[in-house]
């Protein structure tokens, strides 16, 4: 059987609930106006660690020589970090006007201990819906955060987390992970979270002049959405992970003009892919990459200002208490609507995670499949300059992304990620 294609079984060994060492009772944390834009739903993130060695454990405060001792260390550190990140140990409730709030009641975080009959090198990273979902990530989620720690046959470990996206985004969750790892290594925490919602308060402004018209296009109150036609068949998006070499990123920037950021150049490249997958927008197909990058910059610039985000806070305030959804994720029941949409995340890299037995060999986010929207999440690597890209897109876009010549290299297994012999593909 080819490496990266192995099917495997997972056995749950135990389920424990880890509570903070200092309890918080009855405190309610309201959602900010930005938080109210996020619909209920869980996101996942997982970290793969090689089997510990004396070299990788040299900075550990105790001997992480066995899986049980590592799990015990994770639990002990988790109970401490939840004192600082106490909302993650709570649960969502509804307030008197129907909006979600976090009840900080110290219910704790479920931690699952499991065993998987597979080696780390055999994991099919390219297709995480098969190799990761419901295997290395918690399948049943209680509260805001659930964690699964899985021992692999080779002695490697995967720490999988599933969390309610309304409570935390990728950046703040990485703050939590970094703090958890610091405590595990008896190191001081670098960043302390702030729960001061007044920093994100809307301006004193009347609803009639509180919003830029662009927000009415980007977001939609759920009550405005048409009812879904049950006879309409919408294809599910697929999850894939790709590798892009630093050489290809540099080549994109060269073709797009060095005045543009790498993220703008990457977005311009993706625009042309979307145009190709839709078999239309000929003007975009005929444009040079540098010209498309200029257009991306023109559209992006207004959305990177302080006024833009202040205006968004005002827009949400004017529409409270109506549930709101990003238009890109609003399923459409019009069979004739064949538009293609895609969004790109911030493209920032995050700190390496080390609980005391070495840095994670690989990590990625994971999201349940949906039927409309789609996005690309580029994750620049701090040491090599290479990118890992998590993609949740339609099958037609996958075909366009992988059509040669392309910068997207399917990440079939960990060997592709760890190899230093990658070559430029563009």
PLM feature spans:
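Short, intrinsically disordered/low-complexity patches at protein termini
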Residues: 182, 192-194, 411-414, 422-424
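Soluble acyl-CoA-dependent acyltransferase catalytic core bearing the H(X)4D motif
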Residues: 2-5, 19-26, 39-40, 44-347
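PEST-like, low-complexity acidic/proline-rich intrinsically disordered segments
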Residues: 1-11, 401-402, 423
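Detector for long, low-complexity, acidic/polar
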Residues: 29-30, 34
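N-terminal low-complexity acidic/Ser/Pro-rich tracts
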Residues: 10, 14, 20-22
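Short, surface-exposed beta-strand/loop micro-motifs that present aromatic residues
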Residues: 36, 144-150, 372-380
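Low-complexity, glycine/alanine/valine/leucine- and proline-rich hydrophobic stretches
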Residues: 330-417, 424
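Short, low-complexity polar/charged micro-motifs in intrinsically disordered terminal tails
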Residues: 100, 421-422
